[in-house]
A protein has these predicted regions:
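Glycine-rich phosphate- or other oxyanion-binding loops that anchor nucleotides, phosphorylated ligands
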Residues: 60-96, 103-107, 155, 162
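Short beta-strand->loop
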Residues: 93-95, 125-128
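N-terminal glycine-rich anion-binding loop in soluble enzyme alpha/beta folds
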Residues: 3-70, 74
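Beta-sheet entry/capping signal
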Residues: 1-3, 88
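Mixed-charge interfacial surface used for oligomerization/domain docking
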Residues: 3, 9-17, 22-23, 27-36, ...
Length: 300
């Protein structure tokens, strides 16, 4: 038996966390000097959406927000509990080239394994991405576990998936990318004036890079739809992830348009994690799906 862990950047809604028996370790943000836990396991989907709206309204209003890492001590305590219950540990991480979280978990895992106190194993999978790119892989792992597949078999299969799991997104305001150094302040101002909406993606090394520029929000949303429909493989077997930073109507639009073109197993449509979402800003729409690789083909 094994436990499946994610950090709250994985964006798995609370009801699915319970259904798939996934353990979530939450980021904690400082909002105007007060701690705010990013994941609440007891919220309904409606409450999650309202909390997301309230949070991103605070971001729009200029709240002072600081994000941080989950400490190695928190990881160590969580992993130890599973090991002491005679269970292996499988952890799906936010890309180590986006966050230092992977390293925190690695330190915890090494300390536990080097102690010699446990016969069970810890395996970590770097999603090379963020948000539902992590979450969907964790859900697939849970489904394999439910079928009775062995720990190493599940981990071996899912270790091959980050190279195929695509994440593409567009933002509402370029100033948030400028704050994180992904765009110059001057370029952000000019881009906003001209209504330039970049399409960004996670590349094969787990870095966020620009894919192309679109003129206007609707054009950017349609480009996201095209990228999903043109690059997804075996969509009828896949869950497509949609994470939005208080852009619910736009999330419904892209979901409905995709269904006009391809038949998919299902969607997860949820509010963007507050930690990573703070860096991309309100009105961001991100989409996650499996392709043959991460070399995207655009509109056809």
């Amino acid at each position: 038996m094994f436990e499946i862990f994610v950090d709250s950047a994985a964006n798995i809604p609370a009801e699915l966390v319970k259904a798939f028996k996934i353990k979530v370790l939450s980021f904690v943000n400082l909002v105007n000097g007060k701690e705010m836990t990013c994941f609440d396991p007891d919220l309904t989907p409606e409450e999650e959406r309202q909390k997301g709206k309230d949070y991103y309204d605070m971001v729009r209003a200029g709240a002072n927000i600081k994000t941080g890492l989950i400490s190695s001590g928190v990881f160590e305590d969580a992993f130890r509990e599973a090991l002491e219950a005679d269970k292996d540990v499988l952890y799906f991480s936010l890309s180590k080239n986006i966050s230092g979280n992977y390293n925190s978990a690695r330190i915890a895992a090494e300390d536990l394994m080097e102690s010699g106190n446990y016969t069970r194993k810890i395996r970590m999978i770097d999603s090379l991405n963020a948000s539902l790119a992590q979450g969907i892989l964790a859900i697939y792992a849970s489904e394999m576990r439910e079928k009775g597949m062995a720990f190493d078999e599940v981990a071996d299969i899912l270790e091959t998936c980050p190279a195929k799991m695509n994440g593409v997104f567009t933002v509402g305001d370029l100033k948030y990318l400028a704050r994180t150094g992904r765009l110059s302040g001057t370029a952000a101002v000019i881009g906003n004036v001209l209504s330039i909406k970049p399409i960004l993606r996670g590349n094969k090394d787990g870095y966020i890079v620009q894919y192309k520029k679109c003129r206007g929000r609707k054009s950017a949303l349609n480009e996201l739809i095209s990228l999903v429909c043109n690059n997804i493989v075996e969509p009828e077997k896949q869950i497509i992830g949609i994470a939005h930073a208080d852009a619910y109507e736009d999330s419904l639009y892209v979901m409905e348009e995709i269904q006009k073109h391809i038949k998919v197993r299902g969607f997860i449509n949820t509010s963007y994690d507050f930690c990573t979402g703070s860096h991309v800003g309100p009105d961001t729409i991100a989409m996650f799906f499996m392709g043959n690789d991460r070399e995207l083909q655009g509109m056809k």
